[in-house]
Amino acid sequence: MSGESVIEFTGFIKACRLFRENRLAEAEAVCTNLLRKNPLDQATWALKMQCLSDSTYVDELENEDMGLAETFLDQNVIAPNARPGTSFARPKTSAKGVNPILRPTTNAGRPLSGVVRPQSSFKSGSMDQAVRTARTAKTARAVSSTSARNMRLGTASMAAGADGEFVNLARLNIDKYAADPQVNRQLFEYVFYYLNDIRVAHQIAGTASKAAGFEDYYWKNQLAKCYLRLGMLQDATKQLQSSLEQKKLIETFALLSKAYNRVDQPMAALKTYSAGLEVFPENVTMLTGMARVQEALGEYDESVKLYKRVLDAESNNIEAIACVATTYYYGGKPELAMRYYRRILQMGVSSPELFLNIGLCCMAAQQFDFALSSILRAQSTMTDDVAADVWYNIGQILVDIGDLVSAARSFRIALSHDPDHSESLVNLGILKHREGKIDEARSLYSSATSKNPYMFEGNYNLGLVSFTQGKYHECRELIEKALAAFPEHEHCKKILNHLKPLYESI
């Protein structure tokens, strides 16, 4: 064995070998050395561009982050007054879906889901309020500009190279290289993912598509990606529909559904996913996309069915497991939810959120010994961005066992980690209200409603205080806000019925 010669790859073959093994930094270094010896080596030039673009690759199917301009200045929505259940802005009402008591909402007014997604954390409201809100890991403020964020990402990775910019686009003959099928794909991905110059990337894709006689589905998909980044959603839809006529791909169906979601047409997105499932039966990407849309529309039963189909096809899909577990927990089945969360734990995922969820499920299922150990584990491993939620849930458990003093202390600790934690403000206000400290309770309720206007508990409790103090006009406004968030809340309806004779007598 010792006498056998060992094959050692060198030059371009070594770079290709390293690239296939996903050792991108080493492959890039080999390509750099080769280009110093021969700057006109086109194959090495293309391989280095591929290494750089793969190092900053972002999956466009999961890239849902939108900036302030895209969020508040969106002119692509087709129906501003859509029927409930046919628009993300108007999901199914509480009478048909899960009410906010059983399914709490986030600061953005959306029901809690099993996983955090960028688009599900957007906080609607005025542009002025969003600009004045600082963007941290704990807020729902959209980024100032997605294009600027991507540009900073590209320039930061580019600055890491000692040779500076690899391709000088200002001096490059774009039309020449874009028409060359040997290097145009690598050049496009380098400009699109690494440099994030969407204008030049669009020029490359347009020239390449023209050189291919407008018959290459790949370039139609790339043009659609550019249009999606630029906010030209109608043009993106046309390119993707034309691409599907030539070749049906999973990516094309998913991108077309994404474009429909961006223009607030979830029904069209669901039809596109269904058409994709006819071509690619039980595909995880299609099923997951359909489940997300159904969840955003308030169709939790349909969403869970789709997530279960995802698990039948891919049993280790964490998003599907977490979403099914969340639905079971809020549906009053903590034992089933605990099984799913433990499955995630067995797969090697370890996070304070997971331990906290297991602890809450154990507490609801009367398994107090496991609940205590899980919550202590969550408390010991928590980070700053989840500390407020951990302490809030600890306070909830202390309220359940009757230790109100320690519960109030837990809510204060939660507020010290996140002053905008509206749930802790409301619960602390309720405890102050029980103690007879009406002014403190009123102040806490007011803070909660200003932090999260979509949480009906804050508006209802503040309206109740106003009703007892004789401030009937303020009470009516607050109760109407609470009913807008939870139309079937009986206590709000009773207060409104008490107020009607007073207004009629005037």
Swiss-Prot record:
It is found in: Cell projection, Cilium; Cytoplasm, Cytoskeleton, Cilium basal body; Cytoplasm, Cytoskeleton, Cilium axoneme. This is Tetratricopeptide repeat protein 8. Component of the BBSome complex. The BBSome complex is thought to function as a coat complex required for sorting of specific membrane proteins to the primary cilia. The BBSome complex is required for ciliogenesis but is dispensable for centriolar satellite function. Required for proper BBSome complex assembly and its ciliary localization. Required for cilia biogenesis and both the assembly and movement of intraflagellar transport proteins along the ciliary axoneme. GO terms for biological process: chemotaxis; cilium assembly; intraciliary transport; non-motile cilium assembly; olfactory learning; positive regulation of intraciliary anterograde transport; positive regulation of intraciliary retrograde transport; positive regulation of protein localization to ciliary membrane. Disruption phenotype: Mutants have normal body morphology, but with reduced body length and width, delayed larval development and decreased roaming movements. May exhibit defective chemotaxis tendencies. Defective sensory cilia structure and function. This is characterized by increased accumulation and mislocalization of intraflagellar transport proteins and impaired movement of intraflagellar transport proteins such as rab-28 along the ciliary axoneme. Disrupted assembly of the BBSome complex at the base of the cilia. PANTHER family: TETRATRICOPEPTIDE REPEAT PROTEIN 8. TPR repeats lie at residues 217-250, 251-283, 284-317, 319-351, 353-385, 388-421, 423-455, 456-489. The gene is bbs-8. It comes from Caenorhabditis elegans. Its main location: other. Residues 83-112 are annotated as: Disordered. Expressed in head and tail neurons. Expressed in ciliated male tail-neurons. Expressed in thermosensory and CO(2) sensory AFD neurons. Keywords: Cell projection, Cilium, Cilium biogenesis/degradation, Cytoplasm, Cytoskeleton, Protein transport, Repeat, TPR repeat, Transport. It comes from the Eukaryota. Part of BBSome complex, that contains at least bbs-1, bbs-2, bbs-4, bbs-5, osm-12, bbs-8/ttc-8 and bbs-9. GO terms for cellular component: BBSome; ciliary basal body; ciliary base; cilium; cytoplasm; dendrite terminus; neuron projection; non-motile cilium. The keyword Cytoplasm applies. InterPro entries: BBS8, TPR-like_helical_dom_sf, TPR_rpt.
